[in-house]
């Protein structure tokens, strides 16, 4: 039995992604019986095709090279095992359930805030991905220039984000935006999986951050990942009750790296995995700086009625071990 799922990267607005339980970042998932199973590929390499239609200033060959660099960046994560294989150019369009993973341009003027989107065909008996397509919206202007091009979005940056979806990651909330005419502008992003793209001409999105690396390693981790990295588990509570949908951020006092997770149960439980050994400051904050629907289904029941709060102690994470029973207490606004 199969089903289709989708996730998107937007220019100034957001779209639904499905969350799997209890992990740093968010992982895409599907219901298997009464539980949510993380989406993942059963076998590598992921074999993909490129649609043979180019756009202004981007030939199919240039597009394929940029897509290949995006896959290579994910493959370069030392604590995760992924690989890909470009099979060839085809006339087939993305977003068609035909058993082939196709990446290409499509003109979608009706989606005037969607830069690109990823869809899946999933085996709902076990959560394995059978096919995943990515479309880039040719309504926008695109570039593959090494240093970016003014007034054009960078193919490689957007590809890195969408390939993260293709591999099973959802969105990260590690970023800051400001309201501008027509939507929000990204000021800073600490994850390639942040759901709003950098502005035209910007190529900062070509780089993975600690949160992305922790996420992909959680899904496809190497033995070294389990051996060398630790986790923090606990709850976010308000007046003694769990807070659902809180964003919990771990800040490494030595490294300065940020890895984050969410409370995904009524009990307010969270787990942040993929942490280097060391000490961390923990912060819980509401998802009130954007569209909640870019992270959770509309009926998930996210609580945003609380103030930012910090755990009252620095947390020491051992190499290959975990810290449990952390409680971050928040108060209503």
Enumerate the language-model features and the residues they cover.
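Zinc-dependent metalloendopeptidases
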Residues: 20-333
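Bacterial N-terminal signal peptides
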Residues: 10-17
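Bacterial N-terminal signal peptides that target proteins for export
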Residues: 1-10
């Amino acid at each position: 039995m199969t089903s289709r799922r989708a996730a998107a990267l937007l220019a100034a607005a957001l779209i639904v992604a499905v969350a799997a339980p209890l992990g740093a970042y968010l992982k895409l998932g599907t219901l298997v019986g009464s539980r949510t199973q993380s989406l993942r590929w059963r076998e590598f390499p992921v074999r993909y095709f490129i649609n043979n239609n180019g756009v202004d200033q981007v030939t199919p060959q240039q597009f394929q090279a940029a897509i290949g660099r995006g896959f290579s960046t994910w493959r370069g994560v030392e604590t995760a095992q992924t690989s890909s294989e470009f099979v060839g150019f085809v006339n087939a369009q993305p977003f068609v359930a035909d058993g082939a993973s196709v990446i290409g341009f499509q003109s979608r003027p009706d989606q005037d805030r969607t830069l690109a989107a990823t869809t899946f065909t999933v085996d709902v008996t076990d959560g394995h991905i059978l096919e995943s397509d990515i479309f880039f919206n040719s309504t926008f202007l695109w570039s593959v220039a090494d240093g970016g091009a003014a007034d054009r979005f960078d193919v490689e940056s957007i590809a890195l984000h969408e390939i993260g979806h293709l591999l099973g990651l959802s969105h990260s909330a590690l970023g800051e935006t400001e309201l501008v005419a027509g939507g929000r502008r990204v000021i800073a992003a600490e994850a390639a999986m942040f759901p709003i793209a950098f502005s035209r001409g910007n190529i900062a999105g070509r780089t993975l951050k600690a949160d992305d690396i922790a996420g992909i390693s959680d899904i496809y981790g190497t033995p070294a990942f389990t051996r060398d990295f630790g986790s923090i588990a606990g709850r976010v509570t308000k007046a003694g009750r769990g807070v659902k949908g809180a964003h919990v951020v771990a800040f490494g006092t030595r490294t300065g790296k940020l890895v984050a997770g969410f409370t995904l149960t009524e009990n307010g439980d969270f787990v942040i995995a993929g942490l280097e050994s060391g000490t961390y400051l923990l912060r819980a904050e509401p998802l009130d700086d954007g569209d909640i629907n870019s992270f959770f289904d509309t009926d998930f029941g996210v609580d945003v009625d609380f103030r930012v709060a910090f755990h009252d102690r620095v947390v020491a994470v051992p190499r290959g071990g975990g810290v449990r029973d952390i409680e971050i207490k928040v108060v209503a606004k």
